[in-house]
Regions:
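Short glycine-/aliphatic-rich beta-strand segments at the starts of folded cytosolic domains
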Residues: 1-11
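C-terminal structural segments of small proteins and small subunits
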Residues: 50-86
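Amphipathic, hydrophobic secondary-structure cores in small proteins
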Residues: 11-56
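A generic structural signal for short, non-catalytic loop/turn and secondary-structure boundary residues
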Residues: 2, 25, 37, 62-64
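Intrinsically disordered, low-complexity regions enriched in small/polar residues
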Residues: 7-9, 20, 28, 67, ...
């Protein structure tokens, strides 16, 4: 059985669309949800099978492409499409 996994990412408002397009380009690895556009907070929901790949993509965007994408929280999906609730 597949388990869902999520990342809460701090970005800039102007980087959200690019992050979304990159994740979408890798069809099926995750779904991007904007939590707070003005604050630049997005949530990427993936699976345990793809979590390492998604983490690598996010870190690569942050380090090599001038995109602010800092993972502030990650773990098993808590069941919300909009925010990573504790």
């Amino acid at each position: 059985m597949l388990s869902s996994y999520e990342f809460l990412i701090q970005s800039r408002k102007e980087d959200i669309d690019f992050i979304n397009k990159v994740i979408e380009a890798y069809e099926g690895i995750g779904v991007v949800r904007t939590v707070d556009a003005n604050a630049g907070i997005v949530n990427v929901i993936s699976t345990d099978d793809f979590k390492d790949f998604v983490r690598t993509i996010i870190e690569d965007l942050d380090k090599n492409y001038g995109v602010e994408a800092k993972i502030t929280e990650e773990g098993p999906w808590k069941g919300s499409l909009y925010v990573n609730k504790k």
